[in-house]
Amino acid sequence: MNFKYIVAVSILIASAYARREENNIQSLSQRDVLEEESLREIRGIGASILSAGKSALKGFAKGLAEHFANGKRTAEDHEMMKRLEAAVRDLDSLEHPEEASEKETRGFNQEEKEKRIIGPVLGLVGSALGGLLKKIG
């Protein structure tokens, strides 16, 4: 009779352990789903902010291009315009997606392009504004 109780208690303990493990797994998968949803929301917000920034930057670059096109350019102005044109081309390439099968690669490449573009473009914008302020002042 003691053997039956030992077996019954062992089965109860094993089933309780199995239920607890199953609940832990479900809890982890629910957390993963919530984290993934949060990341998607953050990426969506970041993409919209980046898109607005790209549009503003492209408008600014085009305005600078028109300003420099109407006047005489020095070699420094010419070099700055070349860099701005390259930055605008890179920004345009970010907006045109490739094939759907290359989606993951495109995401990685887009992040790399954004990293490569943002630093130099901010420097160019700063130097362009500084140059304009010098000419105006």
UniProtKB/Swiss-Prot annotation:
GO CC aspect terms: extracellular region
Asparagine amide carried by residues: N70
Pfam annotation, one family: Bombinin
GO BP terms: defense response to bacterium; killing of cells of another organism
Disulfide bond entries: none
Annotated compartments: Secreted
Main localisation: secreted
Family indicated by similarity: Belongs to the bombinin family.
Protein name: Bombinin-like peptides 2
